Amino acid sequence: MSKRVLTSVAWPYANGPRHIGHVAGFGVPSDVFARYQRMAGNEVLMVSGTDEHGTPLLVQAEKEGTTVQELADRYNRIIVEDLAGLGLSYDLFTRTTTRNHYAVVQELFTGLYNNGYMVTQTTRGAISPSTGRTLPDRYIEGTCPICGAKDARGDQCDNCGNQLDPEDLIDPRSKINGETPEFIDTEHFMLDLPALAEALTTWLKGRTDWRPNVLKFSLNLLEDIRPRAMSRDIDWGVPIPVEGWQDNNAKKLYVWFDAVVGYLSASIEWAWRIGDPDAWRKWWNDPEALSYYFMGKDNITFHSQIWPAELLGYGGQGSKGGEAGDLADPALNLPTEVVSSEFLTMSGSKFSSSKGVVIYVRDFLKEFGPDALRYFIATAGPETTDTDFTWDEFVRRINSELANEWGNLVNRTVSMAYKNFGEVPTPGPLTAEDEALLAESAKAFDVVGDNINLSRFKAGITEAMRIAGRANQYIAAMEPWKLAKDENQRERLATVLYTALQVVSDVNTLLTPYLPFSAQKIFETLGGEGIWAAQPEVVEVTDESPREPVGVGLPEEGRTYPVIMGDYTKQKVTWARQEIQPGTQLSKPKPLFPKLDPELAETGPEWAPVQK
């Protein structure tokens, strides 16, 4: 029976081009998952966008002497182009600086406020002694008081994942000029997490199928739960929709309050962009719908605690009760699973644009194409542990696995069939060896599919490649090149090549979620016509919204910007064996995965940072 599956993908921050570490965490895994779900016959809604609020953009805009919106516009376009080039099949990839997003964020806040889960409290805020300027928490860095990491931020330590306040830091310093900040009293809106703790605990304890590291970390957060500030002393962000606050341009909603609402606002935007304004409700209000959230491990807190708390409070499901808001009919669905990846490093160091330790997605795509990067991430990415990227490992995997194992299987199988028959040959009687291979290949659909469904992407692609290896062993044992020299063995030649072609078709289907670009080429080589694996498109749209936000500093109405969308219903691929038909005309195969120069294993391309 068909299911509805919401695939919510972490929002990349619009302060620069994305590097391969970013897409290893949120991009490729989520796309493999979404493509598989569509192939399996499920209704998928995959949403995300660029995150364009918060301190880092302000700091960078000041350094570059430009406005924050101009900076966000620049990198929004670059990120959209790069992610579309990688084949990430979003139904909508939008941005947080839209009028629709502001309005939906304000609706969530208002519901929480009306239900008593958003309360004001005087807290300690930081200011610059030299300028008197307010320093939001992400302007401040220092030593984490919990794990001792030296570069913890004023809202969170990325090393241990714990939430912090700026005054918690040991030896705090300003990111702008390095000076020690002063702390003064300031009033903010707090999300009353203690009032939602019981509901959060009940929900989390039912998530027994989550990755153990994610569940354990999330449950540990509840041991010291306290109200969390959801506003900031900053002039860039969503206005606070409360009288006396909404026209104060010096206070805005916290970037992480609005960023997680983006999954909902993007779904709502997608619905009215396709002309069916209530379509989003099928994924958000139907209790049978499933929702999966993909991100790096540094964002677990916001997806397993803050976002569920916002949803519960908006629905009046905390200890204070309350009325469900207009978007909850009867409720907004909580995450089915939070799928967190670990970090991808480079030669043992964290990716860092400022330090030159970075490989940008667009540079990688120009040099090697999308499927090479997708393959490396799927087979060697940081699925459950931190993983190190080296050019040596990349070259080895592309040459020995993708080119030698899979590319060689396709090339020699189709080449022999094309040379000897020009079409898919009609087989004779199948031997035990033929039937065994075909049965093993057919069984792989369940194995690979189950693994992808459980977010075990490495295990899935490993099984698909194992079948490719078995087919290569079969061809080596059957020796069709010898059969081709004996006219009396022509029927047996046809049978062997038919069997091998069927397995090539099977493996191509199994690899389609992982390698959609080469899958389309192989489909055509095997005589297929039309769209096998649909790709996303970049579309220019106008910022307009059926909901009107309030306050000062709103996005300009009517401006245009790029989004990623796609019609994935037009593709032919399904998650099942496609029976090849004798007589189907074949095409002469072309090299799919050119072997990489072994010298690249030493230092990578000329544009790449030098490995140490």
UniProtKB/Swiss-Prot annotation:
InterPro entries: Anticodon_Met, Met-tRNA_ligase_1, Met-tRNA_synth, Methionyl/Leucyl_tRNA_Synth, MetRS_core, MetRS_Zn, Rossmann-like_a/b/a_fold, tRNAsynth_Ia_anticodon-bd. Binds 1 zinc ion per subunit. It is found in: Cytoplasm. ATP binds at S353. Gene3D superfamilies: HUPs (3.40.50.620), Isoleucyl-tRNA Synthetase, Domain 1 (1.10.730.10), Methionyl-tRNA synthetase, Zn-domain (2.20.28.20). Is required not only for elongation of protein synthesis but also for the initiation of all mRNA translation through initiator tRNA(fMet) aminoacylation. This is Methionine--tRNA ligase. It comes from Corynebacterium jeikeium (strain K411).
